C-alpha cells in the first residue's frame, strides 16, 4: 500500500523545469521548479512586462492558454474580475506545474541583463525636507535605460528597496537615486539617520519597463513625490541625445516644501529644443500661504493643457495618483496603450 501511495504522489511532483511558450511570438523560455514566471524571465534577461512584482499593479498579466500553475496569492487582486475569468493571471504570482502556453499583449525580447555588484555611497545631498539624493559608485559598471530602477540592499540595516535611477548614465559610472523618508522605513530611516558616506551597499540592476518610447507625440509627464526621479532621468537623457519633444510636466506635491529639483528642471527648460511647460500643483498648501501657483490635484488641470494634438502619458509616483492620471488621460482621448506608468509601492520592512 505504501508503495502505491509513493507512486501516486510522484505523479504530482512538478518537473525540474517547465517550458513557457509565448503564442504568436515563436518565443519560449525555461522556468526552474519553484520560480515564478516573472522571476525566471527577469533572471534570464527577458523583458517580461512588470512593475511592482508583488501582485498589485497587474502589469505582468498574461493569458494562460494551456497548462497548470500554482498561484502564490490570488491573481484576482491585481486584475479585474472579467480578466481573471477570461484566463488572465499574473506572472509574478504563478509557478508552473508543467509546460505552459501563454499569450502576452507585448512582444518579448532580450533586456539588459541585471548584474549584482557592491557599491560605496559617495555622496548624500538633501533635496527636500524628506528627500535625499544618494550617489553611489559601483564596483562594476551598470548599464541601464533611463527610467529603469535598481534593487538596493543594505546589510547594515537588513533591508532591500527599489529605487529608480535619477540621472542618466555618467562617464565615471556613478549612479544617483532619490530616497524619500518613509515613516518607520528601515532603509530610509537608516540613510537619514546620519552621514552614510563610505557605507557599502549591494546593487542588483537594471530592472523595469518604464522609459522613453519613440514618437513625435507631446509627452504628458506626471510625477508625484520621488516619481520625479525617473522622469527627470528620461528628460535629461533626451537632452543629451538631442531628441527633444514637446513636454508638459505636471509635478504633484502636498506643500511648497515638498517641491524639489526645480533648478534642474528649469535648466532643462532653458536648453530644451521645443515646448516645455512645468506645472507644479499643490494639494495641501495652506490657503494663507504665499503660493500663487495651482492648487488641488494634478488631474484637474489636464484639460486646460491638452488641446487636441497626439499625446503620450509618462506617469510615475504613488499608485492612487498614477491610477487617477491614467483614467483622466484616457477620458480625454489618450489611447490607454500610449500611457506608460511606473507605480511606486512601499515595500514592507524586510
Curated annotation (Swiss-Prot):
Thermal profile of function: Inactivated at temperatures greater than 40 degrees Celsius.
Membrane topology of this protein: Peripheral membrane protein
Notes on how activity is controlled: The reductase activity is completely inhibited by quercetin (a common inhibitor of mammalian oxidoreductases) and p-chloromercuribenzoate, but not by iodoacetimide, N-ethylmaleimide and pyrrazole.
Keyword Metal-binding: yes
InterPro entries per UniProt: 2Fe-2S_ferredoxin-like_sf (IPR036010), 2Fe-2S_ferredoxin-type (IPR001041), 2Fe2S_fd_BS (IPR006058), Beta-grasp_dom_sf (IPR012675), Cbr1-like_FAD-bd_dom (IPR008333), FAD-bd_FR_type (IPR017927), Flavoprot_Pyr_Nucl_cyt_Rdtase (IPR001709), FNR_nucleotide-bd (IPR039261)
Keywords, ordered alphabetically: 2Fe-2S, Aromatic hydrocarbons catabolism, Cell inner membrane, Cell membrane, FAD, Flavoprotein, Iron, Iron-sulfur, Membrane, Metal-binding, NAD, Oxidoreductase, Plasmid
Organism (species): Pseudomonas putida
Protein name (record): Xylene/toluene monooxygenase electron transfer component XylA
Amino acid at each position: 500500500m505504501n508503495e502505491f501511495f509513493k507512486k501516486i504522489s510522484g505523479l504530482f511532483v512538478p518537473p525540474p523545469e517547465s517550458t513557457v511558450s509565448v503564442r504568436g511570438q515563436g518565443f519560449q523560455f525555461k522556468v526552474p521548479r519553484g520560480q515564478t514566471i516573472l522571476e525566471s524571465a527577469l533572471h534570464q534577461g527577458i523583458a517580461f512586462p512588470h512593475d511592482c512584482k508583488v501582485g498589485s499593479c497587474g502589469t505582468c498579466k498574461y493569458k494562460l492558454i494551456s497548462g497548470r500553475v500554482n498561484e502564490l496569492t490570488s491573481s484576482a487582486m491585481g486584475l479585474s474580475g472579467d480578466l481573471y475569468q477570461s484566463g488572465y493571471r499574473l506572472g509574478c504570482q504563478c509557478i508552473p506545474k508543467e509546460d505552459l502556453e501563454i499569450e502576452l499583449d507585448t512582444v518579448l525580447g532580450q533586456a539588459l541583463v541585471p548584474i549584482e555588484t557592491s557599491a560605496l555611497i559617495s555622496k548624500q545631498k538633501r533635496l527636500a525636507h524628506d528627500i535625499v539624493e544618494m550617489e553611489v559608485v559601483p564596483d562594476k559598471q551598470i548599464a541601464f535605460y533611463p527610467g529603469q530602477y535598481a534593487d538596493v540592499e543594505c546589510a547594515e540595516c537588513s533591508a532591500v528597496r527599489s529605487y529608480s535611477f535619477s540621472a542618466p548614465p555618467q562617464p565615471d559610472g556613478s549612479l544617483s537615486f532619490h530616497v524619500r523618508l518613509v515613516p518607520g522605513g528601515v532603509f530610509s530611516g537608516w540613510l537619514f539617520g546620519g552621514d552614510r558616506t563610505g557605507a557599502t551597499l549591494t546593487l542588483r540592476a537594471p530592472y523595469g519597463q518604464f522609459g522613453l518610447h519613440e514618437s513625435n507625440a507631446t509627452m504628458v509627464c506626471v510625477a508625484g513625490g520621488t516619481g520625479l526621479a525617473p522622469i527627470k532621468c528620461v528628460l535629461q537623457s533626451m537632452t543629451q541625445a538631442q531628441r527633444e519633444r514637446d513636454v508638459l510636466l505636471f509635478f504633484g506635491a502636498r506643500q511648497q516644501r515638498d517641491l524639489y529639483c526645480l533648478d534642474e528642471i528649469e535648466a532643462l527648460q532653458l536648453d530644451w529644443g521645443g515646448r516645455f511647460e512645468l506645472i507644479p500643483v499643490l494639494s495641501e498648501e495652506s490657503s494663507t500661504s504665499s503660493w500663487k501657483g495651482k492648487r488641488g490635484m494634478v488631474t484637474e488641470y489636464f484639460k486646460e493643457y491638452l488641446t487636441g494634438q497626439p499625446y503620450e502619458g509618462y506617469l510615475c509616483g504613488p499608485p492612487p495618483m498614477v491610477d487617477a492620471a491614467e483614467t483622466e488621460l484616457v477620458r480625454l482621448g489618450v489611447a490607454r496603450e500610449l500611457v506608460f506608468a511606473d507605480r511606486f509601492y512601499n515595500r514592507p520592512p524586510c
